[in-house]
Amino acid sequence: MSRKIILIKQELLLLVYELNRSGLLAENEKIRPILAQLEKLLLCDLSPSTNDSVKN
């Protein structure tokens, strides 16, 4: 994964954290599960252990 893509994914993950933390979307039943899924995917993708296992 290129450095630029990693940085974009990290910024996106920070944005998801901020949206969750702010509570602005807490009442939106459609967006909340999508953000949770996006957060999970980004964390898995950016996890060093996941990336190490893919490389080997």
UniProtKB/Swiss-Prot annotation:
It comes from the Viruses. Somehow affects phage production, although the protein does not seem to be essential. Gene K overlaps genes B, A, and C. Belongs to the microvirus K protein family. This is Protein K. It comes from Enterobacteria phage phiX174 (Isolate Sanger). The lineage of its organism: Viruses, Monodnaviria, Sangervirae, Phixviricota, Malgrandaviricetes. The gene is K.
